[in-house]
Amino acid sequence: MTLSVPDCAEMNRIRMSNHRKMSLGSAPLIANGRPSPPPRRTSLAESIRTLAFTARRNSSPLYRKSTKKLKKSRLVGKNGICNVYNTNVPKKDRQYLRDIFTTMIDVKWRWMLMLFASAFVLSWSIFGTTYYLIALVHGDLSLPTPVNHTACVMNLDSVYSSFLFAVETHHTIGYGHRYITTECYLAGAIVCLQAICALLLQSFMVGIVFAKMARPKKRAETIIFSDKAVICLRDGQLCFLCRVGDMRNTHLVEAHVRLQFITDRETNEGEIEPLHQFEMKVGPSIADDDRLFLVWPTTLCHVIDSRSPLYNYNQQTLMSAQFEIIVLLEGIVESTGMTAQAKTSYLPSEVLWGHRFRKLVTYQRSNGSYQIDYDLFHSTYPVRTPAMSPAEFYSSKPNLKDYYCHDSHEHKLEDNRSSDSTPLPSPSPYSYPSTPLNHFQSSSNSPVFSNNHSKFNTEAVTCEAGMLCPPTIVVQCPSTCASPNHMRRTRNQMDKSRTSSSCDLTRPSTALSDLEEECSDSGSPTKCQSPPVVPIHIEIVSET
């Protein structure tokens, strides 16, 4: 015996057929053979409440349709809007009315303009009705006008004319056909009162409109954050990186950034503290300095050390973690002097382990300026990064040569995007010895020097620490230099044509200041325009 299970389309057809039968009056039978009870009738108030709840649920950003994949809830959206709602606040309306100025600034433009239009119409109606009652009591509306009778307001004979007189008084348009006389002191007092109320109402409206237009909320929308954050090695330390940029030419003054790590925390007594905030030290480099110079896009760096909340997360546990990292950027708007705040957040699924951000800045030699390509603002590329947690990585004492990955291909991409070649980056102080002079004064057993000669082995320096040493400038000591603190270094003789058109090469340019201090009469080195291609051999001469 074969059982056939109806598909979803057939089940929907059967359900619609049963619903149609119920609407026609034939009640279907239930399992025990008894007819189903009639549906409960709902009241009008209950139906209105149900419709209001459905409309509010559909318009809420928390609502997710069943046909779509459910997304993880977050406290702060990518656009900076906080996903937090307050309920059951005692005396909320009363507190909002006490702070009416802030309430009016926070409401939307359409509600604010509608409220002000209603306030104007209400003011005109109240004072127009007052003028009409004064004219009615004074007898100005009687059809047979008495002889030698002076009205309080001339030519005010209907409700509409009194309304127009109130509008003229409110906006100081100027009296024409209708004007006030000195017959009634009460009418004059009402005119003065209306002038004061109109002045207060217009001042309040202008102040709110100006404050609403000048607030830096829209200025914060021109600050963009990267869609993804990355974790990679930087100077031998695992770092959490994200990128921030400002699209405007008027920059933020005294900009500083903060990182908040939000997760549930369990105390020693077993109490679960929801949404606990951990402060994460962050800055534009590995130094703990939260101040930014936001002229070009900056990569924010948080060093993952023992004090970091990311210290025990590895590549696998990061994907199943439950936390949220909120980035807060604050600064003073240069044009208005007001404080602007931009914020975003990153979930564990938005943190890429073992990636770097692509470079945006391209030097244009044609006009001497720097070009920023925002098409690559969110782009990353994978690099060699340990998959273990920072705690395990630091305790294992790894060899950093295994994770070295020079981004020379990024500079080639910059050369292709630029109209002219991009200048070489300055050497990093982490790639070279701290005392270059001692590096050259090493013993003969060092792999940098050959066994039988005191010549400098360029291949050993090139492969030292797994890093490529870029071409650098040499400073020749003058013949009159008699300093006993360093050795004389001379070059092998080369072709005269090459010597006249090229510059000498030796160690990094960061050592120039050492040589200048040791040689009192040495001149400033000449700039290198076209470095030679062939390697330069350097001889070590003993002290004189």
UniProtKB/Swiss-Prot annotation:
It is a multi-pass membrane protein. Pfam families: IRK, IRK_C. The keyword Zinc does not apply. Coiled coil: none annotated. GO terms for molecular function: inward rectifier potassium channel activity. Expressed in neurons in the head and tail with no expression detected in non-neuronal cells in these regions. Also detected in the egg-laying system of adult hermaphordites with strong expression in the HSN motor neurons and weak expression in vulval muscles. GO terms for biological process: potassium ion import across plasma membrane; regulation of egg-laying behavior; regulation of G protein-coupled receptor signaling pathway; regulation of monoatomic ion transmembrane transport. Residues 135-158, 178-186 are extracellular. Residues 411-448, 512-533 are annotated as: Disordered. A motif (Selectivity filter) lies at residues 172-177. Residues 438-448 have a biased composition (Polar residues). Inward rectifier potassium channels are characterized by a greater tendency to allow potassium to flow into the cell rather than out of it. Required for modulation of the activity of the hermaphrodite-specific neurons (HSNs) by the G-protein coupled neuropeptide receptor egl-6 which in turn controls egg-laying behavior. This is Inward rectifier potassium channel irk-1. It comes from Caenorhabditis elegans. The gene is irk-1.
